[in-house]
Every structure is written in structure tokens, then in C-alpha cells.
Amino acid sequence: RLQADTFERLVLGQMHETVGPQEDDDPIEFYIQVLADKTGSLIAAATQAGVIFSGAPSAFEEPLRVYGEKVGVAFQLLDDVIDLSSKPEDTGKVPGTDLRAGVPTMPSLLLGVETDPVSVALAAEIDEGVQRIAAGEDPSILDDALARLRDHDVTRKTLDLARSWTQGAIDELDVLPKGPVREALTRFAQSLADRSS
């Protein structure tokens, strides 16, 4: 049943990502749900299976499922920050790869709800650049705009949001007795949060 539920969430998450939010959907909440359905559900299944196969008390199953889902969301939010701030020589990726391909990220979604003229202009510049790249122009046309997005407050907000999801995951571990398992799961969540440093 666990595998079937996880597969269903993965498929729904991918379908929702492909189709995109509907007119009455909040794009930010929608994006978080996609992250939870995709990466979150995979890590949640692993932590839930750990409880089941280890013979641990069933009372640990739901908190550890939630822990895994929150870790997955935090991981993807941090990926959005890393996608903008990474150095090609460190990662082998050009910064902003996702956005250049037209894939929304949390910084771009947060930028889209900003109302100050500088943010509105930057969002429009990125949207136009994505359309031009899709039409065949060189992806480097977005280099300057993505550097400004990297330095924009919305990227820091995304990092703060990721850290909040990480802390939420760690808080779910309060049901576990103190010991090596709880410590290892705490370190795992913290190590994911530290990837952005």
C-alpha cells in the first residue's frame, strides 16, 4: 500500500507540475504541494518504511512520514536557491538552469507577487527572456536578470522558507526517544539545510 500511495502522489505531482496551477490556485501553495507530492513523498515513504520494517512503534509512523515530506520540500526549496547561486565550476550547471527552461522556482514565484516597480520589471524581464529562449535565442540573454534575482530579497526569503521547513521536519522527531536514530535524522535534515551555505 505504501508503494502504491507513493507512486500515486509522484504521478499526481508530475501531472500538476506539467499542467500548472489553475486560475483559482495560489501559485505558491500549488508549488509547495507539487514539491510535497514529488520529492516529499519519496523521502516520506523511506522514513515510513523505516518505521514499518524496523518494528518500531506504529505511533512513530505518521510523524516520520511528515518529517520525510518536510525534508523533501526543504530540499527542493534549497535546490531553487542553489540553482541561482551555484558556480558552474562547482556544479557543472549554468546558474538559473530551471528558470531558463521555463520551470518555475520559488524565487520566481515570490518575485511574481512583489509589487514594487523594480521587482515587477525584473519579473517581466525574466518572463520575456524565458519566452525568447523557448523561441530559440541564446540562454545567456538571462544572465544579468538571473544575477539580479539571485541577489533579490525573494531568494533570501526562499532560503528562510527552506530553513523553516527543515526546522518543521526536525520538530516532528520530538516523538522519538533521544538516541542515535533521532540524532541521525536530525543531522540528515540539518545537512540538507547546510548545502546552501
Where are the regions that the model predicts?
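All-alpha prenyltransferase/terpene-synthase fold signal
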Residues: 1-197
